[in-house]
Amino acid sequence: GHSSSAPFCDGTHKKRGFVGAETASTDTFDQRAETIEGKSLTVRDDKRCAFVRFCHAENAQGERENIWSILAKGDVASDSTVRELASACPAGRLNVQSESGELLEPELKPGITVVQDPEQAVSAGLYVHGYIPLESADGEEYELRNRYMLCRCGLSREKPICDATHVPAAFDDGHIEK
């Protein structure tokens, strides 16, 4: 989180004594996630939140609602919004589940995106998408996922996964558009 050439590593972590011990569970999404039943859709939520807030949408009255309140409505328009919001979650926290139990995932090309959060005036994590494997320091692979966020600030309690600690830490890599 202190590189002078962010988002690239310049070795500063060694000079600062950074301890990057991995603390994230290697349990699968299915093992971590709770099931939330709507009227006509089911959403799986594993609580790994990077605080990107794509799970919120503005309703017809101009008020912000979250995916959980929209899911409870259960009408066609709401179901469409729930699918969109769940698919937009870069952390992969939220997934709509089909009637057969399959997680409905968006088709994403492999890539890694540096995320900034101008609304909170902080730099966020790395959005990894398109089923890019994640290997732990000991060589064990995490479950292959379509979407996840990696910590960049170095302060996550779920390393290497982003847990939104960058927000209270006011992490700034020097590239936030203000």
Regions found by a protein language model. Name each.
Residues G1-S3, C49, L150-S156:
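Short Cys/His-rich zinc-binding micro-motifs
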Residues G20-T42, E99-Q120, A124-L126, A170-K178:
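Intrinsic disorder/low-complexity detector
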Residues S3-S4, D30, E135, S156-R157, ...:
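Recognition helices and adjacent regulatory flanks at domain boundaries
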Residues A6-G17, R53-S69, E84-G101, K159-A170:
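Iron-sulfur cluster-binding cysteine motifs and their immediate structural context
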Residues G125-L134, G139:
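C-terminal accessory/binding modules appended to enzymatic or scaffolding proteins
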Residues Q31-F51, E63-E84, S98-E105, K109, ...:
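Ferredoxin-like iron-sulfur electron-transfer modules
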